[in-house]
């Protein structure tokens, strides 16, 4: 996926101008795996300035793995510690994050980050899921309300304006828009977060919202593949089953056929059991589900080579009732996701230890890790100060 020049420039600006290293020596953390992310330890790390394809050769195995993690942070100190000590690829601004992190601390954390630019992500859909409402002018309308009351162009303009406010704060990734197709009541798990029950309407309005974010220099992430709209429940509370794959192809999956072609864009895979596709595994941990997304074979879509994110692996019972965070992270990477997402930092040392063990044991191929690192590097764009 080609990373647009404008988005790369904005990413560099957010990270400020810091020195880069062109050396080929792999980087690594000098902290022990048992160190707490809450205790910052200054670990100088050279910036990696190669083209994306050359980045894996510059990183230690642990730093490669760290680039595949995005974790929720409580506050600036928590973010500083996990970035400095463990060089994680990204942080998530969640419902529990102290928003004073945007008072200047975030810019310092980004400037002093790891070998690649730090991804700063958020769930900012508008409506009832609006993490930044106090900073960007309120919640804004829900997706359903937008589709009922605005034109496609108006939705693009709204998303661009909100995206610009997010970009000024330092946000680089928004886990939006919701691409689920549903007519479920507003207050259900997806409900009014969806643009509607007609796949064509969802495609048009979600596409406009995603383009508005791109216009602002924020990466949109489509969710929740392969479709939560007709799921049996709420994956926050337990396992969720969708209709069979054959039913999803003509409905829930329709928007992805178009929207995955509109790069740059990411896709979040949901914790959804899909008869005829995933067996008893949720899609987020299923090789078959990620392969469906990657190849497009089976639902009439083109191949997708952009970044694939898991849904939250720590705070949703569809996963946490079955696996600890370390095992869930390993399984989502084994399935082919590029980026494992969860909402706390305390598990990071144990996760990295487990992933390194999996590399040594051949449970997780280094070739797959390298491919994901290249996708992550492409998504982030060039390091600031690297002369590009």
From Swiss-Prot:
EC number, UniProt record: 3.2.1.52
Active site: 236 (proton donor/acceptor), 311 (nucleophile)
Pathway: Cell wall biogenesis; peptidoglycan recycling
InterPro entries: Glyco_hydro_3_N (IPR001764), Glyco_hydro_3_N_sf (IPR036962), Glycoside_hydrolase_SF (IPR017853), NagZ_Beta-hexosaminidase (IPR050226)
Encoding gene per record: lpqI
GO cellular component: plasma membrane
An example Gene Ontology molecular-function term: beta-N-acetylhexosaminidase activity
Site-annotated residues for Important for catalytic activity: 234
Positions of S-diacylglycerol cysteine lipidation: 20
Keyword vocabulary terms for this entry: Cell inner membrane, Cell membrane, Glycosidase, Hydrolase, Lipoprotein, Membrane, Palmitate, Signal
Family: Belongs to the glycosyl hydrolase 3 family.
Organism domain of life: Bacteria
Residues covalently joined to lipid (N-palmitoyl cysteine): 20
Localisation: Cell inner membrane
Binding-site residues, substrate: 123, 131, 193, 223-224
Membrane association type: Lipid-anchor
A Pfam family of this chain: Glyco_hydro_3
Keyword Membrane appears in the UniProt entry: yes
Function: Plays a role in peptidoglycan recycling by cleaving the terminal beta-1,4-linked N-acetylglucosamine (GlcNAc) from peptidoglycan fragments. Acts as a regulator for GlcNAc-MurNAc levels by cleaving disaccharides and allowing the breakdown of MurNAc.
Protein name: Beta-hexosaminidase LpqI
One of the protein's GO biological processes: peptidoglycan turnover
Catalytic activity as recorded in UniProt: Hydrolysis of terminal non-reducing N-acetyl-D-hexosamine residues in N-acetyl-beta-D-hexosaminides
Cleavable signal peptide: 1-19
Effect of inactivating the gene: Deletion mutant is devoid of beta-N-acetylglucosaminidase activity and shows increased antibiotic and lysozyme resistance. Mutant is unable to grow on soluble peptidoglycan as a sole carbon source.
């Amino acid at each position: 996926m080609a990373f647009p020049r404008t988005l790369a420039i904005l990413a560099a600006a957010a990270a400020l101008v810091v020195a880069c290293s062109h050396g080929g020596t792999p980087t690594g953390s000098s902290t022990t795996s048992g160190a707490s992310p809450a205790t910052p330890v200054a670990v100088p790390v050279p910036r990696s300035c190669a083209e994306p394809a050359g980045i894996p050769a510059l990183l230690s195995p642990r730093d490669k793995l760290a680039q595949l993690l995005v974790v929720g942070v409580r506050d600036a100190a928590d973010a500083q510690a996990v970035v400095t000590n463990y060089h994680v690829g990204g942080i998530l601004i969640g419902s529990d994050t102290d928003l004073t992190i945007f008072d200047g601390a975030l810019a310092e954390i980004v400037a002093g980050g790891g070998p690649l630019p730090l991804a700063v992500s958020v769930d900012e859909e508008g409506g009832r899921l609006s993490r930044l409402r106090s900073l960007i002018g309120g919640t804004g309308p829900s997706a359903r309300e937008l589709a009922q009351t605005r034109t496609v162009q108006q939705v693009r303009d709204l998303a661009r304006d909100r995206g610009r406010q997010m970009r000024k704060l330092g946000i680089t990734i928004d886990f939006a828009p919701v691409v689920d197709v549903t007519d479920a009541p507003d207050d259900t798990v997806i409900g009014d977060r969806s643009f509607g029950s007609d796949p064509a309407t969802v495609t048009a309005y979600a596409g406009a919202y995603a383009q508005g974010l791109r216009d602002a220099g924020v990466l949109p992430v489509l969710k929740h593949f392969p479709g939560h709209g007709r799921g049996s429940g709420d994956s926050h509370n337990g396992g969720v089953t969708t209709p069979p794959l054959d039913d999803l192809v003509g409905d829930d999956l329709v928007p992805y056929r178009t929207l995955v072609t509109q790069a740059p864009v990411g896709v979040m895979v949901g914790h959804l059991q899909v008869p005829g596709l995933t067996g008893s595994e949720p899609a987020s941990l299923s090789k078959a589900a990620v392969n469906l997304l990657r190849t497009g074979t089976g639902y009439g879509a083109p191949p997708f080579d952009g970044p694939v994110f898991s849904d939250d692996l720590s705070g949703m019972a569809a996963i946490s009732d079955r696996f600890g965070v370390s095992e869930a992270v390993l399984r989502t990477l084994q399935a082919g996701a590029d980026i494992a997402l969860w909402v706390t930092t305390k598990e990071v040392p144990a996760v990295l230890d487990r992933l390194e063990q999996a590399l040594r044991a051949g449970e997780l191929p280094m070739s797959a890790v390298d491919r994901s690192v290249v996708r992550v590097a492409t998504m982030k764009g060039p390091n600031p100060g690297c002369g590009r």
